[in-house]
């Protein structure tokens, strides 16, 4: 099928968009770049490559606030907890400017002693799992 424009015949391909129309932000999934917001030595080290998610520990593989992920950071594999993401969530939940994570050890203890970014207040409802994170947090949103 062709389109006639003042005697010229243009192929159908010219009518397609030249830019992506997918959603601007998405949740955290594999290969998502994240920002480490605690004061651990590994998180504060200068990265020539940003930390990336290599696995999300839930059923559907899409991470939200409070989910555990596995990161590739400075050539190492480290576990982390998502404490903020760019994707808009339910009403009255904050949307952050970056995808924030806090590094944790295998037993669930945070690696750092302070969290530099504010945490969403709805993590307080889940305080059993995140009590150690909430204890070292400085601000809540």
Swiss-Prot record:
Q: What is its main location?
A: mitochondrion
A GO cellular component annotation in the UniProt record: mitochondrial large ribosomal subunit
> Where are the annotated coiled coils located?
none
Location within or outside the cell: Mitochondrion
Spell out the InterPro entries in the cross-references: Ribosomal_uL14, Ribosomal_uL14_sf
Origin, by domain of life?
Eukaryota
Q: How does it assemble?
A: Component of the mitochondrial ribosome large subunit (39S) which comprises a 16S rRNA and about 50 distinct proteins. Interacts with MALSU1.
- Its protein name is Large ribosomal subunit protein uL14m
* Taxonomic lineage: Eukaryota, Metazoa, Chordata, Craniata, Vertebrata
